[in-house]
């Protein structure tokens, strides 16, 4: 019987199919061999246009940003940042961009995966310096995408979605809302991963590899921020007018302004706690234990109070069920979904997806009883989450009282924040958080 073998993946066996003749089989194999031999070189990678921001700009300016204008934007971005295989970065002392990234690190992180690994302890030759290792594509691209827009091939299957670097917003950092992270913040995220998500720890990478990835993330973020501004410039062009690609505009104004925001950041000050900080298996004195319990009670009162107002999102039982209808800033880039009329939501969702967006999902507050802290489990990490809020998320920054202000002034003190930290740390060990354990320990007397 004339047949061709078809591979059935789920059973890992060959199934005869009567649909093709022997001549068809030979032709098929010949075509496959020709494709394999002629397609040895992988297609060149390219940065994707931010179509969502293009549409947002068109809505804001009331004009169409056509292909010609977008080509000018693409040309300007290539001049400033190069390509995924050959990145560049203008290091201009007048623009303040000279020390933003190290070019050698960009080259090391960029390009296809080569299998070449540089020894951090050795002086690299010129040939080695010009050879990338493809670190970003090896470790990051399948989730975050070539462009760093959080739309890699696995992104749609992950919850939460991978971070989009191109907006310049990063959740877990030591800096206030509205400011970029420090390089140390990015390194820490790489080293420890993000608990409860698909973001793994890269603690086994060498220091030079970590440094290269940190700089490459900064590079992708900077490119995305400049792209947004250039798209806005393109929207204002008259018919036949050219985009301003002068050094003054591209390097000094666009690139320099965005870099300055990153260069000026510093971690928020941390007030030393005046109370013991909750931890299990600590050898507390009786006085310290009483002080800690008092701190936890104060933190609980603040949690339910009108100033901190934690319960409105995290819920009255801290299960993260206070609200379930909001979205993060990345999802709301085109539309403010909570305010989209029900009869328009399907049409607008289709439009958003057609532009490359991922299916909108609600952002849920953290279940504090799990003891799973995405931004880190050190006391300082929780302190920063309460003090600074979480960038790109509905979690607000604390309203701090001016130093020396009296009780009539509304706001939190740094001591209040430490009390909230103690309350949060105590929750996973509360009896409500461990019903199974409590059931075994305190068995009911059955009739």
Language model features with spans:
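N-terminal secretory signal peptides that target proteins for export/translocation
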Residues: 1-22
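Extracytoplasmic electron-transfer domains, predominantly the class I c-type cytochrome c fold
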Residues: 53-80, 156-205, 210-217, 242-265, ...
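Electrostatic cytochrome c docking/interface patches
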Residues: 58-135, 249-306, 319-320, 409-412, ...
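Short pre-active-site segment immediately N-terminal to redox-active cysteine/selenocysteine motifs
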Residues: 136-142, 147, 198, 209, ...
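Bacterial signal peptide processing site
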Residues: 41-44
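C-terminal motif of bacterial Sec signal peptides marking the signal peptidase cleavage site
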Residues: 37-39
């Amino acid at each position: 019987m004339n047949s061709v073998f078809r591979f059935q993946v789920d059973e890992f066996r060959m199934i005869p199919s009567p649909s093709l003749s022997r001549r068809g089989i030979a032709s098929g194999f010949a075509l496959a061999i020709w494709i394999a031999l002629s397609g040895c070189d992988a297609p060149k990678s390219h940065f994707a246009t931010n179509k969502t921001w293009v549409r947002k700009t068109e809505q804001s300016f009331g004009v169409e940003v056509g292909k010609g204008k977008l080509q000018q934007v693409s040309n300007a971005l290539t001049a400033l940042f190069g390509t995924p295989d050959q990145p560049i970065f203008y290091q201009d002392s007048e623009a303040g961009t000279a020390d933003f990234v190290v070019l050698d690190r960009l080259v090391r992180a960029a390009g296809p995966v080569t299998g070449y690994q540089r020894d951090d302890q050795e002086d690299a030759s010129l040939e080695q310096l010009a050879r990338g290792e493809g670190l970003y594509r090896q470790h990051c691209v399948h989730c975050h995408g070539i462009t760093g827009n959080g739309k890699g091939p696995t992104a749609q299957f992950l919850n939460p979605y991978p971070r989009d670097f191109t907006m310049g917003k990063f959740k877990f950092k030591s800096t206030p809302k509205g400011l970029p992270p420090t390089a140390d913040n990015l390194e820490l995220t790489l080293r420890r991963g993000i608990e409860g998500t698909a973001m793994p720890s890269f603690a086994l990478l060498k220091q030079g590899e970590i440094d290269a990835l940190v700089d490459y993330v900064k590079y992708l973020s900077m490119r995305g921020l400049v792209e947004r501004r250039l798209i806005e410039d393109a929207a204002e062009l008259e018919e036949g007018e050219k985009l301003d690609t002068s050094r003054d505009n591209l390097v000094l104004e666009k690139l320099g302004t965005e870099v300055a925001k990153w260069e000026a950041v510093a971690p928020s000050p941390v007030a030393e706690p005046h109370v013991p900080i909750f931890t299990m298996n600590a050898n507390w004195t009786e006085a310290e234990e009483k002080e800690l319990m008092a701190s936890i009670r104060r933190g609980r009162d603040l949690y339910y109070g009108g100033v901190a107002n934690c319960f409105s999102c995290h819920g009255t039982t801290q299960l993260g069920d206070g609200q379930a209808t909001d979205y993060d800033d990345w999802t709301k880039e085109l539309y403010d979904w909570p305010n989209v009329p029900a009869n328009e939501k399907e049409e607008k969702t289709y439009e958003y997806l057609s532009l490359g967006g991922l299916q909108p999902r609600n952002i849920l507050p953290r279940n504090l009883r799990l003891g799973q802290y995405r931004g880190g489990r050190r006391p300082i990490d929780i302190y920063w989450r309460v003090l600074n809020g979480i960038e790109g998320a509905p979690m607000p920054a604390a309203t701090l009282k001016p130093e020396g202000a009296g009780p009539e002034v509304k706001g939190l003190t740094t001591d209040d924040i430490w009390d909230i930290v103690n309350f949060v740390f105590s929750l996973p060990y509360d009896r409500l958080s461990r019903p199974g354990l409590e059931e075994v320990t305190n068995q009911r007397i059955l009739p």
